[in-house]
Amino acid sequence: MSGWWIGLIVVLAAIAGWGVWLMVGRNRVVFGEVEILNPDGGAGTALVVYHPGKSDFQRRVFAGFAEGLVAGGWRVELTTPSPLTPTGLDGVDLLVLGGPTYGFKPNRPIQAYLNRLGDLGAKPTVTIITALGMGQRSTRIMEQLVRRANGTLVKALVLYKARPNDEDNPVGGSQNQDLAVEIATRAAKTIDLAAL
């Protein structure tokens, strides 16, 4: 076999390995503790479950959303979707689900967690999808999954790491990511349990 063919096989194997890492490695379950913010919050209890992905963007967005809820007086339970994540929603007034999109779909751990929850019993639910630049399809899928599980969709956000989050005033790089966090925080501040 010539060196050219061997080189081609090595390149194709590397591309295949990278593809497997993208789809499997990024979709792996991350075990996280339940972090309780504002334990005495009287506005209601929100369970925020998100897949952290491979960068800190998801963590920042969901921390911003949690911060907005806390500013509104909510008790927030923040965690990741794993087999250990609580599935009992008694005492939970608002469910927040999301994380990164991979392969134009919501990440597998959040889909599996939503499956484990079963019937949401009309629970008010917010979805937050993060993406590099194309998250609309993933957001639609997440909305459908919540509705199919008998959840009441309160809000669906899609926030971008690279694509401008404000088409009228585009900013790039870290400014765009900071804007995504700010949008998440503002969105959380508008959620009023009495109006749900």
At which residue positions do the language-model features occur?
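Short loop/edge segments at beta-strand edges and connector loops
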Residues: 80
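Short amphipathic alpha-helix with an adjacent loop that forms part of the alpha/beta core around
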Residues: 84-90
